[in-house]
Amino acid sequence: MSMSGSKKDVESEKQKALDAAISQIERAFGRGAIMKLKQHPAEKMDSVSTGSIALDAALGIGGLPKGRIVEIFGPESSGKTTLALHVIAEAQKQGGNCAFIDAEHALDTVYARKLGVNVGDLIVSQPDTGEQALHIVEYLVCSGAIDVIVVDSVAALTPRAEIEGDMGDQHMGLQARLLSHALRKLTSVVSKANCILVFINQIRIKIGVIYGNPEVTTGGSALKFYTSIRLDIRKVSAIKDKDNVIGNQTRVKVVKNKVAPPFKQAEFDIVYNEGISKLGEIVDMGVKFGFVEKSGAHYSYGAVKLGQGRENAKGYLKSNPDVANELEQKIRACLAESMHNSDLFAVDERTDVLEEEVF
C-alpha cells in the first residue's frame, strides 16, 4: 500500500469518527447543538440604531448588535439614560417590544416621551432587590418577545441580604457575585432570543491610586467580560443660548467592541428636553464629508445658504425638513461605504479604560 493510500485511509477513519461523534451529540442534545459553519453561512449582524448617526458609524455595524450584552457607563448626568432611551425609541420604530428595569426608581416618562419613546407600550419594572431585577430580566429574555431591555443601573442592583441587613453591615463582593451568577445564565439566552440587554453603570473613584486612571465601574469584573460593547459617555462642554445652558456636547468612546474595530469615538449634542440633536449631527457630518461648506461662521449646502453660525444652520434644517432628510441620506450613504475604515472616528488606543471594582 502506498503512503498516499494509507494517508487517505487515516483521513477517512478520522472523518467517520467525527461524524459518529456529531451524531452522538445530536442524539444527546438535539439537532443544532453542533454544526459546521458552512451549513449556516455568515449573515449581516442585525442592529438597532442608537439615535446618533456618528455613534452608529463608530460602532461599525450601524448600531447596537442584537443578541449581545451592552454596557453604557459614565459620570453623573452625562447622558447614559438618554442614550439608552434613544435605543428604545429606535427599536420601537422597528416594531420591537422594549422593557426598562428601573432599579433606581427614577424613570421620567415625560422626558422619555419627548425622546420618542412610546411609553404606553414600554414595559417598566421597579424591582425591590437586585435578585428580583435579574430574575425579571431572565423571564423577559426567555420569552423571546423582547427586543431591547435596559437595566438602570448596575449600582442600584442591591442584593437582598444588604437590604434586609443593618445600615452599617459589610457585604463585600455580594453584588459582584450576584452579577457574575446572573450573567453566566443570561449570556446564552440573550443570544438565542436575539435581544439587546443594556446595562447602565456608574463610576466611582478608587482610593489610593497615584498613577493611572482612578475611575472604576461598579459591580465587579463579570460585566466587563460578558459585554460585547462598552460605551464610555462624557460631557465635553456646555451648549449655551446667550447666557442660558440648553444642553451638552457629548463624546462617546467605544472602549470595547467584539463585532467591529474598537477605540472609535463619536461626538453629538444632547439638548435638554429634546435628547440627541440629529440636526446638529447633520451639520457637523455634512461639513466632515464635504456636503456642507463652512466659510468662517457661514454654512451653505450647494446654493442653499443655511445661515451664520451652527445654531442658525440647525434652525434652517429644522424649518426645512426636506433639505435635512436629503443631507442625512447622503451622509448615511457615505457612512455605509466608510463604516469599516479604521481611521474614521478613530481615537488613540490608550490604556485608560476603566477597571472594575467589587462593591
From Swiss-Prot:
Keyword set, alphabetical order: ATP-binding, Cytoplasm, DNA damage, DNA recombination, DNA repair, DNA-binding, Nucleotide-binding, SOS response
Source superkingdom: Bacteria
Any one GO molecular-function label of the UniProt entry: damaged DNA binding
PROSITE patterns: RECA_1, RECA_2, RECA_3
Major subcellular location class: cytoplasm
SUPFAM superfamilies membership: P-loop containing nucleoside triphosphate hydrolases, RecA protein, C-terminal domain
Compartments, as annotated in UniProt: Cytoplasm
Xref: InterPro entries: AAA+_ATPase (IPR003593), DNA_recomb/repair_RecA (IPR013765), DNA_recomb/repair_RecA_CS (IPR020584), P-loop_NTPase (IPR027417), RecA-like_C (IPR049261), RecA-like_N (IPR049428), RecA_ATP-bd (IPR020588), RecA_C_sf (IPR023400)
GO CC annotations, alphabetized: cytosol
Disulfide-bond pairs as recorded: none
Binding of ATP, residues: G74, P75, E76, S77, S78, G79, K80, T81
SMART domains: AAA
GO biological process entries: DNA recombination; DNA repair; SOS response
Job of this protein: Can catalyze the hydrolysis of ATP in the presence of single-stranded DNA, the ATP-dependent uptake of single-stranded DNA by duplex DNA, and the ATP-dependent hybridization of homologous single-stranded DNAs. It interacts with LexA causing its activation and leading to its autocatalytic cleavage.
NCBIfam families: tigrfam_recA (TIGR02012)
Family statement: Belongs to the RecA family.
Protein name according to UniProt: Protein RecA
Organism field: Anaplasma marginale (strain St. Maries)
